[in-house]
Structures are given as C-alpha cells and as structure tokens.
Amino acid sequence: MADVTLDFQFTSSIEQVWKALTDSDMLAKWIWNNDFKPAVGEKFQFRSEPNEWWDGIVNGEVLKVEEPHILSYTWASAGETTMITWTLKTGADAATHLHFEQTGFSEETKATKGAIEGAKYSWTNFGEQLKKVLEQ
C-alpha cells in the first residue's frame, strides 16, 4: 500500500500532462531545476534551495516509462529512498486523471510525527503548481 496517494484532475490533454511530468523544462516550472530524461535507467537530480534541515538535492533513477500512462522513479533525499509512480488516464469527461503514489518510506520515517503528512502536503502543493503550469 502506498504511503502517500493523491489524485488530480486536469482539463489539459493526457499528452500535455505527460509532457509536464517528463520534460525537464516543464518540470522546472512546477517542481525544481533538474536534468530529468524519461528513459528507464536514467539517473537524474532535482535541485532546490538548501535550508538548515535539507541540502536541496533529490537524486533519482527512472524505473518505468509507459507513455503516456505510467511514469515511475526513485526519489532519494535526506537519507531516504522512496518510489514515485504517476498514473494517467483520460476520463469519460475528457479530463486527464492523474494518480500519484509515493511508497517505501522507512518505518522510522512513518513513526516520525508529521513526516508522511509533510510529504503529502508537499506533493499537494506541487500538484497545484502543475495545474497552474498547465493552464498557462
């Protein structure tokens, strides 16, 4: 079972949402600067401003690419490696439905008050930024 699950809905086409999830320049508009390439085995890095608790770096490796429906990669940051999976579907309403899962948090992290909630909060904010980017 996923530790964090979120569902988003966009009026943009599935191809537009896929591009926002896989194009480095688009990702930089709603997550952080990066060198992401959507190919299995590709290693990448997201870079944000560091703070007193975090170095601002997320390392990852692409695990699965099934354009335009499934994208999965590792998300390694602050000593923890989890797996991110995005699943895209076009609904009967012609909207693009985007399902997000983050799995693999350590038992220590799960036991830390607010850690999973913090991850959910961050990804919810990223989803709101993604919506703004898609509406431009």
Language-model region placement:
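Hydrophobic-ligand binding "helix-grip"
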Residues: 52-93, 103-106, 132
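A generic structural signal for beta-strand entry/edge sites
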Residues: 3, 43, 68-70, 93-97
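A conserved amphipathic terminal alpha-helix motif
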Residues: 103-136
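Generic structural detector for well-ordered beta-strands
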Residues: 7-11, 45-47, 61, 87
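A solvent-exposed, acidic/Ser-Thr-rich amphipathic alpha-helical stretch
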Residues: 33-44, 53-54
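Hydrophobic ligand-binding cavity/cleft-lining segments
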Residues: 1-35
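Hydrophobic pocket/interface hotspot
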Residues: 17, 27, 44-46, 62, ...
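Tryptophan-centric aromatic hotspots in well-structured domains and transmembrane helices
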Residues: 18-21, 30, 75, 86, ...
